[in-house]
């Protein structure tokens, strides 16, 4: 296990030394999204946000309409609270109200709920329910702006209880060591996951790298290497992700996901997105939380976002998108993916309740 983990760390450490040490935690996407990884710096006293998204979707397998995923869909009704208790203590909480069910724990709908203590400007510790440090630019995207996921992200849960130890190499480079419940953990399977992540912000070049060791059964491990890159060029942004997965014999291409994305913002109102994803697993089968053995799928598509009132306190966006998937499905693939068309039109909004209340108060008491 030790030698395999070192082999994962090598590309990460080479990336640190090659890029140089003079940057910060990775910024959001060109669309102004917040980080799913929850590893973002927050300087405000208190923020309370409420947001949701509603879509009208149509999915086809070849020319046959799929009834279950089609129609009106309410997505991601969420409330998030974050703030500073003291100069050293901060907290963050986000609840997906739409995921709270009568037959499940309230925490199943909790994305993250953590308390962080900063020892100094370099070191901090975070504990609670946290985002698993998988890395990649796609993984950083806010759930409300995830229209078409890569096949891998349809399977593992991304939020678990754990502890993060953070170290700021400079104001612009951050390392995170995480010990948390494994994404494979169930009530009958007490397993854990260990991760080293690097977040870099180097002018136009941003990195989100991670090396992971996760138990899929007690004492049995799968290894991940995630390399996420964001490149900013004026009004354009390019996101390139690579994730490698292996259990016994390491191979960079037999079990991997490669994703490329181009985002262009011609003005403050429009965001144009085109993407392509390749996913394969030719090595093993780990059941329902994984890409099935024998899969080799390619997905491409595009999204158009329109923001009629691009304000900081209230975000309103109208979106439309399309994607197509083709290739070879795995031997135990439960949901057919190849020759599948996906179309969506919808609206999303997010409101900063505290900022909006202050704005209304100030207008009434001028």
Task: Give the role of each language-model region.
Residues 70-72, 108, 187, 293, ...:
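Aromatic-acidic/polar surface patches that form glycan- and anion
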Residues 1-53, 342, 346-351, 356-366:
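N-terminal periplasmic/intermembrane-space "pro-region" immediately following the signal or transit peptide
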Residues 134-136, 185-187, 328-329:
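Short catalytic/ligand-binding loop motif for oxyanion handling, primarily in non-cytosolic enzymes
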Residues 145, 149-164, 171-174, 185, ...:
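Contiguous hydrophobic segments
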Residues 75, 109, 121, 159, ...:
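Exposed loop/turn and edge beta-strand positions of beta-sandwich/beta-sheet ligand-binding modules
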Residues 53-67, 103, 118, 202-366:
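Outer-membrane beta-barrel pore domains
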Residues 37-58, 68-182, 199-201:
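Outer membrane beta-barrel
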Residues 176-221:
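Loop-centered beta-sheet repeat module
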């Amino acid at each position: 296990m030790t030698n395999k983990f070192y082999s994962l760390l090598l590309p990460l450490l080479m990336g640190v030394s090659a890029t140089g040490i003079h940057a910060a935690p990775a910024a959001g996407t060109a669309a102004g999204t917040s980080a799913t990884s929850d590893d973002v710096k927050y300087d405000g006293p208190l923020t309370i946000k409420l947001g949701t998204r509603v879509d009208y979707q149509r999915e086809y397998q070849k020319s046959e309409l799929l009834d279950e995923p089609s129609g009106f869909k309410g997505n991601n009704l969420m409330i998030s609270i974050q703030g500073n208790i003291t100069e050293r203590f901060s907290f963050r909480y986000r609840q997906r109200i739409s995921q709270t069910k009568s037959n499940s724990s309230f925490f199943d709908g909790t994305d993250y709920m953590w308390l962080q203590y900063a020892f100094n400007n370099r070191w901090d510790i975070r504990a609670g329910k946290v985002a698993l440090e998988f890395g990649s630019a796609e993984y950083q995207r806010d759930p409300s702006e995830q229209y078409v996921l890569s096949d891998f992200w349809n399977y593992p849960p991304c939020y678990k209880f754990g502890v993060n130890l953070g170290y700021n190499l400079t104001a612009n480079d951050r390392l995170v060591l995480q010990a948390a419940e494994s994404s494979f953990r169930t009530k009958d399977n007490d397993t854990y996951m260990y991760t080293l992540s690097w977040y870099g912000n180097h002018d136009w070049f941003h990195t989100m790298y991670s090396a992971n060791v996760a138990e899929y059964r007690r004492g049995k491990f799968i290894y991940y290497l995630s390399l996420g890159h964001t490149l900013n060029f004026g009004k354009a942004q390019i996101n390139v992700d690579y994730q490698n997965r292996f259990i016994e014999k390491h191979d960079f291409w037999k079990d991997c996901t490669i994703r490329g994305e181009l985002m262009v913002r011609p003005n403050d109102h429009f965001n144009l997105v085109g993407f392509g994803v390749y996913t394969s697993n030719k090595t093993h089968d780990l059941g329902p939380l994984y890409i099935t053995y024998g899969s080799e799928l390619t997905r491409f598509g595009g999204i158009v976002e329109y923001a009629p009132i691009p304000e900081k306190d209230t975000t309103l966006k109208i979106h439309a998108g399309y994607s197509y998937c083709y290739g070879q499905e795995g031997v135990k693939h439960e949901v057919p993916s190849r020759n599948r068309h996906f179309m969506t039109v919808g609206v999303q909004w997010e409101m900063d309740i505290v900022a909006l209340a202050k704005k209304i108060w100030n207008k009434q008491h001028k």
